[in-house]
Structure formats: structure tokens, C-alpha cells
């Protein structure tokens, strides 16, 4: 069953700017209309229980799309249905069926405890007292927050707060959760914990996940399908498996050695930068392995190493390059 159906969705923002006269100066009175197309006739659908990554660079149209899907913004054109409802016309009804977690926007009252927040949200969603207590207890166990559930939110670490944000969004048992940069600012351990929890609610509770993030690790770990949007248009809609093979197969390895060495490029190993004992290397995991790379160095010569995924912006460039070829 399709829980999201989007057809030719468009959003334009209209502003005004002062007209420049023949002498090169801006007029004090004359203005002209400026139309900025944030989302440009996109179409896609999402099946119930899917974990979808909706990603793109800053200003690509991600947040605008999410705001239209959740009823915050009215579309300029096109059709959108979420759980059979028109988000902009049926926003209140839809709010009982969806939840949202935003990494940079708190929904919890920081001076209250997490438990007090949950009671408050339960009353908003008209959840019966006994049912709410059972739900809080169940989710507190899943997310392992019982230890600090009665502490003021302002005293919690960012990782603990994000767990509580997720519990608050799940209290009314939504059919779908929207995540916008939920792991931003988290340390690696907290990120991994949150990723596992998102996968767990998708698998065990059957909650549909609509996920945006700039962290490639997030989407690799959580999602099975990816839509990439850029300049308001969808440039890719594919499985995570295919995206990994064609675009996430490259890793960036930065090493710091005790002594300068002569590293020779091989198939799958490309030197991006070499300065003194610092090396930045691109490794194509489809053609070689980390073991082969590490074989180029002596173990006791290695001082430091970091491994990262290809930046999202580079992935989008690769996609465009492939379309042009």
C-alpha cells in the first residue's frame, strides 16, 4: 500500500526586488517580481513500511518537500497524498498519523522532565491515561531511557535528548516518521545507537521512515531506498544496494606516517593529495580492498588513519557526469 503519493509537485516562492534604472541605481519605488522554484514538478511514491532516504545538498528542496508532505506549506502545483490525506487541507487529521524528529529543532520542553513531556504530548493526542502509561513504559524500554526519564531535559546529553525526542514522536503510534538530520551534532557512538533504534522501529513496529541527512553513514545504515534531489528536481531514485555499488563504493582514507614513502597508484587506489608524511587517498572498494591499501605501509610506520565516505556533493556530481556520458 502506498502511504505517500506525489505527482508533479511544485513549490514557488515569490519575492520582490527593486528595479535597476538605466543609470545603474536601484529605483526607490519600482519593483519587479522574482520567482524562485524550490521544488520543480517532482513525482514519487513510498510504500508502507519502507525506509526511504530523501537527500540532497543545502537548498536542494528537501526541507520544502517535507513541509509540503506534513502540511506546513501549500504546494504551488501538483498533487500530494500522505496516508490518503491531503496534507495542507487535512493537517490536523494527518498529525495524528505521523511523527517528526528534527535534529536542530526541539519539541521537548527543556525545563520539564522527559516523562512530564510525554504526559503533555499524550494529552495533546487524546491518549487514555492507562494506555499512555503502557506506551511510555514500552518505548522507554525500547529506547533505554528509564534511567533518566525523570530528569529535566536540559540536563540530558544530546544523544539522550534525541532518544527522548523519538519517544515523544512515537507516543501516538504513528504510521510514519519524518526524520530531518536526527544525528547532527552527535558523537559516533550516539549516532550508531540512534541509527540502530530507527532501524528497529522500522522493522519491529512497521513504521514507515522518511529520512533526510547529510551524513552518508546515516543513509547507508538506515535506508534501503534513496531519492536524491538537486535544484528542486529528482536526479536519482534507486535502491541503496545500487547506490552503494555505483556511488558509495569509494572511501577517502587519510593517513599520517612517521616517514615519507613512495605510494604507487594501482587500480582502485588513487592519490588525491600527498604532503610530507600526510596522504589523502581515494579507494574504490569495487576494485581493491583496505587490506591491499594497508599493505603499502609498514604497520609500525602508521601514526594516524581516518576513513570517510564520499561526500554527498561528490556523489551528485558523479550522477550528473554519468548522465552526460
Give each language-model segment a name.
Residues 285-325:
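C-terminal coupling/interaction segments
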Residues 177-181:
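Catalytic Walker B motif of ABC-type/P-loop ATPase nucleotide-binding domains
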Residues 20-27, 119, 123, 130-148:
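Conserved ABC ATPase "signature" region
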Amino acid at each position: 500500500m502506498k502511504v505517500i503519493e506525489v505527482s508533479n509537485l511544485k513549490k514557488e516562492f515569490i519575492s520582490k526586488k527593486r528595479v535597476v534604472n538605466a543609470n545603474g541605481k536601484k529605483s526607490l519605488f519600482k519593483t519587479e517580481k522574482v520567482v524562485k522554484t524550490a521544488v520543480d514538478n517532482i513525482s514519487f511514491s513510498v510504500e508502507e513500511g519502507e525506509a526511504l532516504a530523501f537527500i540532497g545538498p543545502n537548498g536542494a528542496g528537501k526541507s520544502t518537500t517535507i513541509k509540503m508532505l506534513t502540511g506546513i506549506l501549500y504546494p504551488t502545483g501538483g498533487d500530494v497524498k500522505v496516508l490518503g490525506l491531503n496534507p495542507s487541507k487535512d493537517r490536523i487529521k494527518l498529525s495524528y498519523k505521523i511523527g517528526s524528529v528534527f535534529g536542530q529543532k526541539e519539541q521537548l520542553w527543556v525545563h520539564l522532565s522527559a516523562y512530564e513531556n510525554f504526559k503533555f504530548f499524550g494529552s495533546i493526542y487524546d491518549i487514555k491515561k492507562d494506555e499512555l502509561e503502557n506506551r511510555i513504559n514500552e518505548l522507554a524500554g525500547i529506547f533505554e531511557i528509564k534511567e533518566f526519564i525523570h530528569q529535566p531535559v536540559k540536563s540530558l546529553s544530546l544523544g539522550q535528548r534525541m532518544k527522548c525526542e523519538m519517544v515523544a514522536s512515537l507516543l501516538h503510534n504513528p504510521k510514519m516518521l519524518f526524520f530531518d538530520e536526527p544525528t547532527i551534532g552527535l558523537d559516533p557512538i550516539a549516532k550508531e545507537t540512534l541509527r540502530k533504534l530507527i532501524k528497529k522501529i522500522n522493522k519491529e513496529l512497521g513504521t514507515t521512515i522518511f529520512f533526510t541527512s547529510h551524513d552518508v553513514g546515516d543513509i547507508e545504515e538506515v535506508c534501503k531506498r534513496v531519492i536524491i534531489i538537486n535544484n528542486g528536481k529528482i536526479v536519482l531514485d534507486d535502491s541503496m544496494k545500487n547506490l552503494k555499488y555505483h556511488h558509495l563504493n569509494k572511501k577517502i582514507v587519510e593517513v599520517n606516517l612517521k616517514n615519507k614513502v613512495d605510494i604507487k597508484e594501482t587500480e582502485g587506489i588513487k592519490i588525491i593529495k600527498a604532503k610530507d608524511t600526510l596522504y589523502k587517498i581515494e579507494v574504490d572498494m569495487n576494485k581493491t580492498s583496505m587490506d591491499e591499501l594497508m599493505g603499502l605501509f609498514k604497520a609500525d610506520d602508521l601514526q594516524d588513519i581516518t576513513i570517510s565516505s564520499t561526500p554527498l556533493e561528490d556523489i551528485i556530481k558523479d550522477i550528473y557526469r554519468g548522465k552526460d556520458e
